[in-house]
Curated annotation (Swiss-Prot):
Ca(2+) 1 binds at residues 13-14. GO terms for biological process: animal organ development; cell development; cell fate specification; cell-cell signaling; central nervous system development; neuron differentiation; proteolysis; regulation of gene expression. GO terms for cellular component: extracellular space; plasma membrane. This is Sonic hedgehog protein. Pfam families: HH_signal (PF01085). The C-terminal domain displays an autoproteolysis activity and a cholesterol transferase activity. Both activities result in the cleavage of the full-length protein and covalent attachment of a cholesterol moiety to the C-terminal of the newly generated N-terminal fragment (N-product). The N-product is the active species in both local and long-range signaling, whereas the C-product has no signaling activity. The gene is shh. Intercellular signal essential for a variety of patterning events during development. Signal produced by the notochord that induces somite patterning, dorso-ventral patterning of the brain and early patterning of the developing eyes. Displays floor plate-inducing activity. Binds to the patched (PTC) receptor, which functions in association with smoothened (SMO), to activate the transcription of target genes. In the absence of SHH, PTC represses the constitutive signaling activity of SMO. InterPro entries: Hedgehog, Hedgehog_sig/DD-Pept_Zn-bd_sf, Hedgehog_Signaling, Hedgehog_signalling_dom. The keyword Calcium applies.
Length: 58
């Protein structure tokens, strides 16, 4: 993220879910999923952010 958008940080908004906010089969209940966004919350970056996550092995 820092190489793609200088000054923008990666935000992890949720990892483990114990409150039941995700669908029943969600990997959040196993600690194998995260919800991420950027510090500027610019939704136009989400496609590229997804690609970066896949390229990083997530």
């Amino acid at each position: 993220v820092m190489n793609q958008w200088p000054g923008v940080n990666l935000r992890v908004t949720e990892g483990w879910d114990e409150d039941g906010h995700h669908f029943e089969e969600s990997l959040h209940y196993e600690g194998r999923a995260v919800d991420i966004t950027t510090s500027d919350r610019d939704k136009s970056k989400y496609g590229t952010l997804s690609r970066l996550a896949v390229e990083a092995g997530f």
